[in-house]
Amino acid sequence: MNKERESFSGRLGFIIVSISCAIGLGNVWLMPYRTGMYGGALYILLVTAFVFLFAIPVLLTEYSVGRGSGQSGATAFEVLPPGGAWKFNGYLGIIGNYLLLMFYVMVCGFTLAYLGKGVSGSLIGLSPEEVTDSWRALTGSAGASFGLMVAIVAAGMGVTYMGLRKGIERVGKIMMGIFLVLIVILLFRSITLPGAGAGLAFLFVPNLDSMREHGTFRIIHMSMGQALFSLSVGIGSMTVFGSYVDKQRRLFRDAFTVGVLDLGVVILCLLMIFPAAFAFGISPSVGEGLIFVTLPNIFNSMPGSYIWSLLFYVGLAFVAFSTAAAVMENLTTIGMDKFGWTRKKSALVNLVLLVVLCTPSAFTRNIWAGITPPTFPHLGSFFTFLTMEIALPVGALLYVVYCTSKKGWGWDNFFKEANTGEEGWIFPASLRFYMTYILPLAIIFILIFGQVQRWILAPMGIVI
């Protein structure tokens, strides 16, 4: 165990790093294409509800467990009472973090490739069809995909190698600032394009057709997973950041702030993408390549397209990388806490391990394209399913039960830790019944019926 725990430079550093871990491509890449797939406004409303009702409370439990134990999610359950079988929750968190990076790193690699395209200007002047062909050519290249994956893993571990303040905190502050400014600029361009009104209607006028097509429980289940993924909660990714927080302030305000800021960025990203998609005749349900085929068309419609595209791809690569680095920080800390390794040794071990684990995602759209689990288009989508639909909800459930059950850490310990400090909001005791009974039962219900809809009812042609 580490004798002296690293800490953030202040509340701003804590918030920025948490936001960096939360925002990332979950908001810029996954949320837009899932919004397109599941019908727009209704999906957004459901995700918003789940952020406030599910994700923020779970985030508070992760922060509390992290600060109370002074450990990462891998060892926190061994340090805090009652120990015993709860330590296996730490192992589930380790698996969940690796699963997350097994598909996420490759998407980060694609953003790096588009940064290169932004520098070279190779997308400038292309037609919408040519932009789409460029995306397909990139994902179809095994060599390019593998090289991009290795580059992201090496860079992310390089940041964690430098330490908390010099590494992940400093990088997060710079990257998030650049990205948010660029999003706002591109948003205004997107909503002023001819035909953008249809995209705004898609985002803000509910349409029940998606419910009838995919099933109510299916969409509700996916919305819950998106909310948890959007805040990176359920697999202990945020627990480690709680362990870096001092006892000077209560945790509820910070958890709420991270949730609201994350949701705000979600809305900004959607406003940046969908009006432009409709303006250029790009289907909102185009899939995971939505941002890679929509945004170049925005730039090609703007004066000074080279400068704007370059700046945006810099920002996109930054925000994608900041999330990957934040999760890698968690894995590095796990090695330090669990095995007593130095930071440098843990970073190097994880570098090798991640290259091996992420290789299937690098090849799944090209030379291993024929190797797919049933009902999944490629291995990357299978890893996404395991993370969002299984690991995150199950992990969130275990964190909540651990913090509220007498057989776990218990409500009294959780409540005391969440409210320790002289600054910030008091987490209300009146929410005990909700946290103890309603929240865990709701997660179980949605998790079960979402999978029933996917695996049992849908193949029978039954949509509920």
How does the language model describe each region?
Residues 89-92, 339-351, 384-443:
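C-terminal membrane-solvent junction of multi-pass transporters and transport-like membrane proteins
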Residues 35-61, 144-145, 388-396:
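Extracellular loop-to-transmembrane helix junctions
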Residues 7, 13-15, 21, 146-147, ...:
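Loop-to-transmembrane helix boundary motifs in multi-pass membrane proteins
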Residues 1-29, 58-63, 67-80, 84-91, ...:
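Membrane-interface "cap" regions at the ends of multi-pass membrane proteins
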Residues 2-4, 8, 169, 173-321, ...:
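Membrane-embedded translocation segments of transport machinery
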Residues 2-6, 34-38, 73-92, 105-165, ...:
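Inter-helical loop and helix-membrane interface segments of multi-pass membrane transporters/permeases
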Residues 34-38, 85-101, 136-140, 151-175, ...:
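Membrane-water interface regions at transmembrane-helix termini and the short interhelical loops
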Residues 13-50, 236-237, 242, 252-256, ...:
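Transmembrane helix-boundary motif of multi-pass solute transporters/channels
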